[in-house]
A protein has these predicted regions:
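Feature captures hydrophobic
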Residues: 1-118
Length: 118
């Protein structure tokens, strides 16, 4: 079941993937949950893959309340600072990556353009 969920989420998130936010070619993100099976994200260049289980050598380990919180953080519908402050999100490892991952799959905000006329 987790394997299918990860495949479905990958397909949903692929159009929004922005690897330039990481400022590195490779990263391994381990997601551990208070409730729910662990999984990890491997980023290699311009590709990514979510896999069930634990990574061999994660670049960073993210401790998250549950799967729903994780997906909400990744798609930008939940603020990372709020999740951190309420104890739903913390990290061990390369802490800079704990912030950059929050923008890795974020959907672009609509842009507004204004024209000023005299």
């Amino acid at each position: 079941m987790l394997t299918q969920t990860l495949a479905d989420r990958s397909a949903e998130m692929a159009p929004h993937f922005q690897p330039a936010f990481l400022q590195r070619q490779q990263a391994s993100f381990q997601f551990l949950f208070d409730s729910g099976e662990p999984f990890h994200l491997e980023v290699e260049g311009t590709s990514f893959e979510f896999s069930p289980g634990e990574a061999r050598q994660p670049t960073i380990t993210l401790y998250i309340k549950d799967h729903a919180t994780c997906w909400n953080l990744l798609d930008g519908s939940m603020d990372g600072m709020n999740a951190f402050m309420d104890g739903s999100y913390r990290a061990d490892g390369n802490i800079v990556l704990s912030q950059l991952i929050l923008y890795l799959f974020r959907r672009a905000e609509p842009a507004f353009s204004y024209e000023i006329q005299d």
